[in-house]
Regions:
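Repeat-based scaffolding regions
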Residues: 1-113
Length: 113
């Protein structure tokens, strides 16, 4: 049977609306396995992990997303995700260094400090 992404997304969203985060995460992961280019789903999965109080796993998803945005040249989007990470993990020096680097690339020297 062919993969029907739209149907799979609807099912995942339905699970979220029913409060079934763990099942929704599994559904989103299956979608990502079949369509790894849809990195925006990593944000959704990360948010679901955070909602379930699994911060380490949520941070992993956000980190993957930020790295994908950097690879694709979407520095502003990467900055937004790294800022999200820094709010959840206030002790991450690596995140702050990455933010400073991206701010510099964007010509935002004041923010880099």
């Amino acid at each position: 049977m062919a993969f029907q992404k739209a149907r799979a997304l609807q099912e995942a969203e339905k699970l979220v609306s029913q409060g079934k985060s763990a099942q929704a995460i599994k559904q989103y992961q299956e979608i990502l396995d079949k369509d790894p280019a849809d990195v925006s789903l990593l944000n959704t999965v990360g948010d679901l992990y955070i909602r379930d109080r699994n911060v380490p796993e949520g941070l992993k998803q956000f980190q993957k997303l930020a790295e994908a945005y950097v690879r694709e040249g979407f520095n502003v989007k990467a900055i937004a995700i790294y800022r999200k990470i820094s709010k959840l993990d206030t002790n991450s020096v690596d995140t702050l260094l990455k933010l400073a680097e991206l701010y510099q690339l964007q010509g935002l020297s004041r923010e880099a400090r």
